[in-house]
Amino acid sequence: FRGADFQSIHKFNEKVPGSSVLKLSLNYRSTQEILDLSNWLLGKSHLKYDKKLIAYRGKGILPTVETFTNEWEEASWIVENLKEHREEGERWDENMILCRTGFSARALEGALIESKIPYVFIGGRKLFETAHVKDVLSALRIIANPQDDLGWMRYLLLWGGVGDKTASTAISQITKNDSLDQSIEILKRHPKISLESLEILKQGSLAETTEECFKICVDGLFKVLENKYKNKNWEQRIKDFDVIQRLSQTTTSILEFLEAYILEPIYLTEALPKGNEDDVVTVITIHSAKGAECKRCYVLNVSPGGYPITRSMNSGESIEEERRVLYVAMTRAKDELIITRSGNFSSASSSSKIQIEDKKYERYFLSDIKDKLFKNNDHRLLNDDNLTDGSFSRSFPKPSTKIDLE
């Protein structure tokens, strides 16, 4: 569990003289091919785990490593793979997708939502439930329906100098007004309501597409949100807007967008047909996954710089903790293990070692994986045409705040 000291078990004999160790090497969950790859990962450690799991169930199929140009292609492929298995008669709940953090799964969430695949997120907050996304969507809610009191309340409270009392008073003056232009004119006379906040709504209402409206609102609110979330993973939050922007391209109006993804969200289990509430894909953070298992497991974005994560590379102990994290993810699979990754890297570029004290560690855990342990499928194109153009995370300046990716 998080925060535990593995040395308590690893050095148990030293700490408890006269004790004996009984090794439980028979594994009842996974097939031998999955365990062979997991055993190989632990075997690369400088720590002497001396742990070789044997599958009670015998042999199965080789794990696969699927490599993509970027996270959007990675997410799209996973969704198509899920749909193929569904068409073959499988249930959604036979699939589990493991990710490091909620932020790292946003492109995947967008693809699941767009494809109307029901899912539950364990260990993280869903895309449309995050505060920064709700903040921007409050503007779209007002533009679509000027009588949306909750939308007005959330939007006005984003701006400095406006508290609950001021916002409530202002809203009471426009609550029965079905014209956004008239509401804006009334609020312009309120001393504490900024003209900038109203101009964003005005410009957004003039947009010809949902995507254009969304971009106007994000652009206008950018500094306000940056200040609000400057110490709360702002750089990661920006990337969520790229996912929403892509989803906004699938609808013809703001109201249709809100109805599709906010008012009647297909990603909630409550939206499933009666009797199928549990038939959902599980998206789960690895730190929440101990004890979990599933027929088919996808381990998301096992890319260079991610396993081990870059910031762990100044400590051998941290690198070994990263190894155990990946080991936990891989051993959740019962029948099929699919590891996905993305980026423009080669085997040579990711195979270098890092020296820490008197030991050398891998910069990337899968850099020298043995061919007999897995099947490699490289989906990358010769050129990177599918990268997001004009994405919010690229088009806006990076914050100066140091970001903790966890």
Residue ranges of predicted features:
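A polyampholytic, Gly/Pro-enriched intrinsically disordered region
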Residues: G43-S45, E73, L137-W159, N386-D404
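Conserved RecA-like helicase ATPase core segment
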Residues: F1-F68
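Short glycine-/polar-rich loops that comprise or flank the Walker A/P-loop
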Residues: V16-V21, G60-P63, D93, S115-I117, ...
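Conserved nucleotide-binding/hydrolysis micro-motifs of P-loop NTPases
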Residues: A4-Q7, N27-Q32, G60, W72, ...
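Conserved RecA-like ASCE P-loop NTPase motor core of nucleic-acid helicases/translocases
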Residues: L24-L26, P63-N70, I78-E129, V136
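Conserved phosphate/pyrophosphate-binding and hydrolysis machinery centered on Walker-type P-loop NTPases
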Residues: N27-T31, A55, F68-A75, L98-G102, ...
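Conserved helicase C-terminal RecA-like lobe
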Residues: L137-D368, K372
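Helicase C-terminal subdomain and adjacent C-terminal extension
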Residues: N344-E406
